[in-house]
Amino acid sequence: MSSQVSSARSVRQPASRDSIGVEVRNHIGHLTLNRPEGLNAIDLDMVRTLRQQLDLWADDASVHAVVLRGAGGKAFCAGGDIRSLYESHQNGQDLHQTFFAEEYELDLTIHRYRKPVLALMDGLVLGGGMGLVQGADLRVVTERSRLGMPEVAIGYFPDVGGSHFLSRLPGGLGIWLGVTGSQIGAADALYCGLANWSMNSEMLPRLDHMLDHLKM
């Protein structure tokens, strides 16, 4: 079925606390992590909004693909909201248990998603952000991309599936990332398979334009 932009659906939908932007344009669902002041670190509300919207679009025949991105230009996602998780643990609450369980379920949903998922990994992609993108079908990095698992610096193991995807990287690079918490750029991400396409960040608006006019 062909769809010109003039006839394409453009639908904006409310998201929890506006921390997730939700939009459908030209049969493509766009999900934007919208906490730029916190480098788009994800909290439980955001995890639930992402999962709910992905589940809705999975059964919506008018949505043919999904794009994930972060707002602000500095980060796709800097990981989980560590402050809220730490405070929960210190106060004897179980937010941290609920968060990690549902975050893992969200990542698994993306790995098993029935429709193509494009992840725009512009800026920081750390910890939980790595978990979000590794299940995507197309993972795009830019000259601003920095990938890593910084949670190991506070004594935590590489989570969100890190023990799976890091162990499969060539040349022992995954072990190095998982032990040191170091960050890598676009070229290294492409080399080791953590990304499969690169473009200049200045071209991202052009990519949006092309998606809005894509015939499907």
What are the roles of these predicted feature ranges?
Residues N200-M216:
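Amphipathic alpha-helical blocks and their helix-capping loop/short-beta junctions
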Residues I110-I154, G181, A186:
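Glycine-rich beta-to-alpha active-site loop
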Residues G70-E105, G155:
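Glycine- (often His-adjacent) and acidic-residue-rich active-site loop
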Residues L68, D81, L132-V133, D188-A189:
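Hydrophobic/aromatic residues within transmembrane alpha-helices
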Residues S163-G172:
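Hydrophobic, secondary-structure "cap" segments at the distal end of domains
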Residues M1-R69, L108:
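Conserved CoA-thioester-binding segment of acyl-CoA-metabolizing enzymes
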